[in-house]
């Protein structure tokens, strides 16, 4: 994914970007009835990657697969996080038009509203308990030269590092693969414990915009803390009993690099229920 991502250099010569064709080499050898390739939205939407998309379609067709390429919003399927991913799906013996219709019709059955961050975190054991231990102790410090946008949560850079504040009464922004240390999202525990109270982050942002304070004058309250591994996993819809291994930084990265589990399950069920039952029943293109 990294070679195609807008977060990277997006170089056509990136060796990692060639792995999408290696994927189809594996398909050619194993001849599965269906396949699913997942990648970043940019591969499906940016003009610079159109030659790659064309090669994927042509190669899959030569291998006898009808295909469709779709971009899905995780929030449309009950995931409490704004995350979009591309899925390239193929099936033997079915036309591409039929693959597309089977997939899109099947997806409709799984659409569900997404919960807010508050709803998700409130269902977990309390922060700092054995069931939700502290996993990031990076101090929350104010940026010396903040960047201000209209919202404290969207676009504004108020704190040191890449960790952004979490808006509790909305879905989470995309959890980054670089989580860990001061790149870990920030939660205001007092606002989580007291619904309806104004977030200090919002007050600070407003005071900066109106010239009533500065980073030198403001004092960060002790209730600002970092998102835990358990909380990040819940926002990615991992099962509660899922075990992550490695250092805390590696655990955060495993979560940030993942496809939300509920979205992955949805795609898998659609392939199982809508495509596998039709493989070979129709004439391929």
Regions found by a protein language model. Give the residues of each.
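Short glycine/serine/threonine-biased micro-segments
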Residues: 1, 76, 254
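Short glycine-rich anion-binding loops that position phosphate/pyrophosphate groups of nucleotides
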Residues: 1-2, 40-42, 93-94, 180
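Short acidic/His/Gly/Ser-rich catalytic and metal-binding motifs that mark active-site loops
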Residues: 2-6, 244
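Short, solvent-exposed loop/turn and secondary-structure capping segments
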Residues: 5-8, 47, 100
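Short, histidine-centered active-site or binding-site loop motifs used for metal coordination
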Residues: 8, 39-41, 248
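Short glycine-enriched, charge-decorated loop/helix-capping segments at active-site entrances
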Residues: 8-14
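Conserved Class I SAM-dependent methyltransferase catalytic core
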Residues: 16-92
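S-adenosyl-L-methionine-dependent DNA methyltransferase catalytic core
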Residues: 59-62, 85-285
């Amino acid at each position: 994914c990294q070679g195609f991502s807008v977060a990277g250099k997006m170089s056509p010569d990136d060796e990692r970007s060639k792995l999408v064709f290696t994927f189809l080499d594996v398909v050619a050898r194993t001849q599965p009835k269906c396949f699913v390739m997942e990648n970043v939205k940019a591969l499906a939407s940016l003009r610079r990657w159109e030659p790659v998309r064309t090669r994927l379609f042509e190669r899959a067709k030569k291998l006898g697969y009808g295909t469709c390429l779709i971009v899905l919003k995780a929030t449309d399927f009950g995931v409490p996080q704004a995350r979009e991913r591309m899925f390239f799906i193929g099936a033997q013996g079915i036309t591409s038009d039929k693959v597309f219709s089977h997939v899109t019709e099947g997806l409709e059955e799984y659409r569900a509203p997404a919960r807010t961050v508050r709803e998700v975190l409130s269902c977990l054991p309390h922060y700092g308990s054995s069931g939700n231990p502290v996993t990031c102790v990076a101090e929350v410090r104010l940026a010396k030269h903040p960047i201000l946008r209209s919202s404290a949560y969207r676009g504004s850079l108020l704190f040191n590092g890449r960790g952004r504040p979490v808006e509790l009464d909305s879905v989470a922004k995309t959890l980054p693969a670089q989580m860990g240390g001061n790149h870990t999202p920030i939660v205001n525990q007092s606002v989580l414990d007291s619904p309806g109270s104004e977030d200090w982050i919002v007050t600070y942002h407003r005071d900066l915009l109106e010239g009533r304070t500065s980073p030198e004058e403001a004092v960060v309250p002790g209730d600002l803390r970092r998102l835990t591994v358990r909380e990040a996993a819940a926002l990615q819809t991992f099962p509660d009993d899922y075990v992550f291994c490695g250092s805390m930084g590696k655990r955060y990265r495993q979560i940030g690099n993942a496809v939300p589990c509920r979205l992955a399950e949805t795609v898998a069920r659609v392939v199982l229920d809508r495509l596998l039952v039709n493989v070979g029943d129709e004439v391929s293109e």
